Amino acid sequence: MVWLANPERYGQMQYRYCGKSGLRLPALSLGLWHNFGHVNALESQRAILRKAFDLGITHFDLANNYGPPPGSAEENFGRLLREDFAAYRDELIISTKAGYDMWPGPYGSGGSRKYLLASLDQSLKRMGLEYVDIFYSHRVDENTPMEETASALAHAVQSGKALYVGISSYSPERTQKMVELLREWKIPLLIHQPSYNLLNRWVDKSGLLDTLQNNGVGCIAFTPLAQGLLTGKYLNGIPQDSRMHREGNKVRGLTPKMLTEANLNSLRLLNEMAQQRGQSMAQMALSWLLKDDRVTSVLIGASRAEQLEENVQALNNLTFSTKELAQIDQHIADGELNLWQASSDK
């Protein structure tokens, strides 16, 4: 039986222009970092994607190494795209990235032209696409000249394999340089994807949002819920069914050492604030990011379709009082959760 999307889907989502481009992204986008590998049930993935699109979420964000195993998220997404979303391809924004380890040998990671363009070709094959809407340099590679990375991104657009290009976890200084390098190719930098949330505010401290705004570049925040810390799930310890319990000390994963007393105090205060606002902690965390018009979109993940419905309700209240903002600034400590700092510090 052919699946038909909700005909009212565009009436319940906000869409924002991405920097100075003509492209609009949904305020909430779906990230496929977790829960879309071969270890996850395909029907669960199908339900999540269908629910997202029915809610007006038109942007699906992937990377070459998402899984596990690496590449499997793109393979699964490609299958579901063919089976459920083929008729809606022109209503979707599909992005992928390359930067982290993907295959053995010296050409399987980084920012070289060899790696980036080979990875893009592999991603297109896995997803069954002729092009992606956005192709990212996933991280800074200090061993590759930025001029080379920029040339690869420009080639992706010029060859018709990507409509736009972006970067992720770049410092303001490197972001500015990438803007200028791409400008030489007459290719605009569309978007930057940084880790950003209430407990990880390096974006604020570094002035990245100002750099993006000054150059007409959009911003899409990933880990807006601090990989689950800002959902309220860990207020009373580590549940047995939680990702923190499953992942242990995984690199760039959610680990027990993140539950410091300072972070727990911050979570308790944020939970109280959310209750006073009539929101869940997760909804308030999303609202806090989207209160700033410089944030184009926020990348959310989901293990269940129902989570998406709760998250979308965050859009009903994006206003914060002066008192609320002051309380956050004064009492919410940095949680030392920027696990991608090795890239943004370079």
Curated annotation (Swiss-Prot):
Catalytic activity: a primary alcohol + NADP(+) = an aldehyde + NADPH + H(+); hydroxyacetone + NADP(+) = methylglyoxal + NADPH + H(+)
Residues where NADP(+) binds: 33, 61, 66, 168, 193, 223, 225, 227, 233, 303, 307, 311
Domain of life: Bacteria
Site positions (Important for catalysis): 61, 66, 97, 138
Keyword annotations: NADP, Oxidoreductase
Induction section of the entry: Expression is not significantly altered upon methylglyoxal addition. Expression is decreased in dose-dependent manner with glyoxal treatment.
Intrachain S-S bonds: none
Record-linked Pfam families: Aldo_ket_red (PF00248)
BP terms from Gene Ontology: DNA damage response; methylglyoxal catabolic process
EC number(s) recorded for this UniProt protein: 1.1.1.-, 1.1.1.2
Disruption phenotype: Cells lacking this gene show 23% decrease in the amount of acetol. The deletion mutant shows sensitivity to glyoxal.
GO molecular function terms noted in the UniProt entry: oxidoreductase activity, acting on the CH-OH group of donors, NAD or NADP as acceptor
PANTHER family cross-referenced by the UniProt entry: HYPERKINETIC, ISOFORM M, L-GLYCERALDEHYDE 3-PHOSPHATE REDUCTASE
Function, as annotated: Aldo-keto reductase that catalyzes the stereospecific, NADPH-dependent reduction of L-glyceraldehyde 3-phosphate (L-GAP) to L-glycerol 3-phosphate (L-G3P). The physiological role of Gpr is the detoxification of L-GAP, which may be formed via non-enzymatic and/or enzymatic racemization of D-GAP. Also contributes to cellular methylglyoxal detoxification by catalyzing the NADPH-dependent conversion of methylglyoxal to acetol. However, the catalytic efficiency of methylglyoxal reductase activity is more than 2 orders of magnitude lower than the L-GAP reductase activity.
Membership in a protein family: Belongs to the shaker potassium channel beta subunit family.
Protein name: L-glyceraldehyde 3-phosphate reductase
Organism: Escherichia coli (strain K12)
Chain's gene name: gpr
